[in-house]
């Protein structure tokens, strides 16, 4: 098995302060580019409405990884599915990809909304979202993800 060493290119500043399954919407945060990268690496990004952001579940522990089928969120109404069918910190590399909306760029700071990472999260990579690189046909999925994520993007101000 190959091993890769990666360094974060940016850090999430502000936004969500705790991990929570739902109510991720409407929260603004900053993706702050590390000083090691010249500002020129962001040139032109302000012309895009959305970003593709790969980040690490930095609050997760190695022992959180689960390499077996289980019901999403522990809900027995949903079918047991394998590790690579889940989008959470229990994956082997504890990485996630999100598609926040880019509001503006201020120097090293990319102000975004709807980034479901918490303050202090290391960003491994970022790129503009190209519509042409999204799914090329209709998306098919079982019913449980829509049921499970029905409240995911509700406004965070409505959190119980």
Region spans (language model):
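Glycine-rich, low-complexity intrinsically disordered segments
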Residues: 1-99, 103-160
């Amino acid at each position: 098995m190959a091993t890769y060493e990666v360094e974060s290119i940016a850090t999430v500043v502000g936004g969500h302060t705790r991990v929570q399954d739902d109510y991720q919407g409407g929260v603004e945060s900053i993706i702050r580019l590390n000083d090691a990268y010249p500002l020129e690496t962001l040139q032109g990004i302000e012309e895009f409405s959305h970003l593709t952001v790969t980040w690490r579940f930095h609050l997760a522990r190695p022992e959180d990884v689960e390499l077996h089928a289980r019901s999403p969120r522990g809900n027995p109404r949903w079918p047991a599915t394998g590790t690579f069918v889940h989008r959470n910190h229990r994956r082997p590399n504890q990485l996630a990809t999100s598609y926040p909306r880019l509001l503006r760029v201020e120097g090293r700071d990319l102000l975004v909304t709807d980034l479901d990472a918490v303050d202090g999260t290391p960003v491994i990579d970022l790129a503009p979202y190209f519509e042409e690189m999204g799914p090329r046909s209709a998306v098919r999925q079982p019913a449980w993800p829509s049921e499970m994520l029905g409240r995911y993007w509700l406004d965070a101000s409505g959190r119980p």
